[in-house]
From Swiss-Prot:
It catalyses: L-seryl-[protein] + ATP = O-phospho-L-seryl-[protein] + ADP + H(+); L-threonyl-[protein] + ATP = O-phospho-L-threonyl-[protein] + ADP + H(+). Residues 20-306 are extracellular. Involved in negative regulation of abscisic acid response in seed germination. This is Lectin-domain containing receptor kinase VI.4. The chain crosses the membrane at residues 307-327. GO terms for molecular function: ATP binding; carbohydrate binding; protein serine kinase activity; protein serine/threonine kinase activity. InterPro entries: ConA-like_dom_sf, Kinase-like_dom_sf, L-type_Lectin-RKs, Legume_lectin_dom, Prot_kinase_dom, Protein_kinase_ATP_BS, Ser/Thr_kinase_AS. GO terms for cellular component: plasma membrane. It is a single-pass type I membrane protein.
Amino acid sequence: MGRAKSMVSLLLVLFLVRAHVATTETTTEFIFHGFKGNQSEIHMQGDSTITSNGLLRLTDRNSDVVGTAFYHKPVRLLDSNSTNTTVRSFSTSFIFIIPSSSTSNGGFGFTFTLSPTPNRTDADPEQYMGLLNERNDGNSSNHVFAVEFDTVQGFKDGTNRIGNHIGLNFNSLSSDVQEPVAYFNNNDSQKEEFQLVSGEPIQVFLDYHGPTKTLNLTVYPTRLGYKPRIPLISREVPKLSDIVVDEMFVGFTAATGRHGQSSAHYVMGWSFASGGEHPLAAMLDISQLPPPPPNKAKKRGYNGKVIALIVALSTVISIMLVLLFLFMMYKKRMQQEEILEDWEIDHPHRFRYRDLYKATEGFKENRVVGTGGFGIVYRGNIRSSSDQIAVKKITPNSMQGVREFVAEIESLGRLRHKNLVNLQGWCKHRNDLLLIYDYIPNGSLDSLLYSKPRRSGAVLSWNARFQIAKGIASGLLYLHEEWEQIVIHRDVKPSNVLIDSDMNPRLGDFGLARLYERGSQSCTTVVVGTIGYMAPELARNGNSSSASDVFAFGVLLLEIVSGRKPTDSGTFFIADWVMELQASGEILSAIDPRLGSGYDEGEARLALAVGLLCCHHKPESRPLMRMVLRYLNRDEDVPEIHDNWGYSDSSRTDLGSKLVGYISSDRASSSHSHTSSSLTRISSTSLISGR
């Protein structure tokens, strides 16, 4: 009797130990590259079977059949250490095929399922997909979660239309979340739709993160060659906590319908992982998967001669349509042939013309926010994101406009700085050339600097002017010294400075900009820019440099302080005027009188001194933008301005006449027109080299 009691006690201890081990098993991992030889690990019911080459076939094309297949062991998905009902993180990936058929539209679809039991013998076919039936659909006692891959639309409405969508279902086959079958392209984040019933392998990644209750689902054809970065569905699913019980079975269910709405459903490979904060299902090696099934239709009882006649007629008609299509495409290509340039390949962020057309309401006049020498700027609204953009439409048949178009893409397209306008992309449609920028709401600096009080209610404040000046200096420093190449802007002026909603300046319009490798010399031979902002050495050699940008900044700085344009009349030049006031001890007379006493005298004197220093007639005596910014930030003292800063009236007149003569000469005009005869053939090499 005592020995029997000991045996009972020992068995009880062993049972409790085993139960404890079972409750502490919290991770499950498996991977199947095909299912041949794994029959014992897959619990199958209904029409499901494993084919001779290792495919898991859930259903064939027979009408009104159901097939289910679950992993043979339950998976622990509730966190037993938590006081709350917390679903553990899990991850799964599988590759499936639904062969297409010439005699059927397919149906009804299949699901990936979490179920408290692998036995779904009471489930119905058609829209219930072998998971539920008409009596229990929607019951909270089901404790079923499913991702449905539906090829027939019209659940419970009796229409049974052709469908192609993915849904998230909780205790019901009526989806809480539903999306058309698609993936997001990694190149341009565009959504690309595709068909489930295609006969090609399709891969699914399903990841659930327990702490955040977030579910991500990605689906794409394996021919894509990569997993898209953006999931098709990314949602919080708090409902899952009410669905999942301690142990769940994971697997698949599928069903077909009547009246030709039937498909075969195959799973080629499957991996799963649960437990831990970020479990990750093992990657499936496509090379190890069994071959896909043949894409053939189920035989029907049609007369062979009738079928042969239909096939023959269809073939003839198809050939004629293909030939007609090829002829039309050839004719259209001959009319609108477009050859991709190097710069188009290197800078692929291309907008679709129809999107820009919609964004600007057909480029209406009431959308115009500005005009330039070579184009018109429109305000646009991207409907998909509610973002505002600025669209610059280059004047058609303008060769210099085409030069600016390509130059902006090759320079501004790669520059990123808080004080530069951000170029989002470009568009080339027939003879239309368009550049797309961030929309800057406050317009250009000149419109604020010279605005009438009735427009803005007040003149531009001194604090705003000084901060704008420092912001422009910061942007030029980035161009000259901080980017990978040296960028010479060549057209620094108020109309090319845009002011954002926080009154920060953004230097833009890089149509005349040139890029150089560090250590190389500028080799431009054409005088470009705006009268009043061009450095005097341009009249001698036409050679732009960072020093000529510094000169233009100096003029702009004096203009910001004085509120006066650099060349109000034929003999007036702002730097000469400020220098004369400096020499006579009346430098404060240069400050914009509209400011009254609302300015900082120390900052004003500093800005005027830096402006004069930048306007030195000798380029080698002008400071680098690094020093300009240090002066404005008062990190360095500004050198004293000497009497020999300027040049005599005779030398100034001589240089001015040379500059005007140079701009109007044959040399300048011929250099401007040195382009290809085609508007779409502009060499990027010549632009980068500075010609």
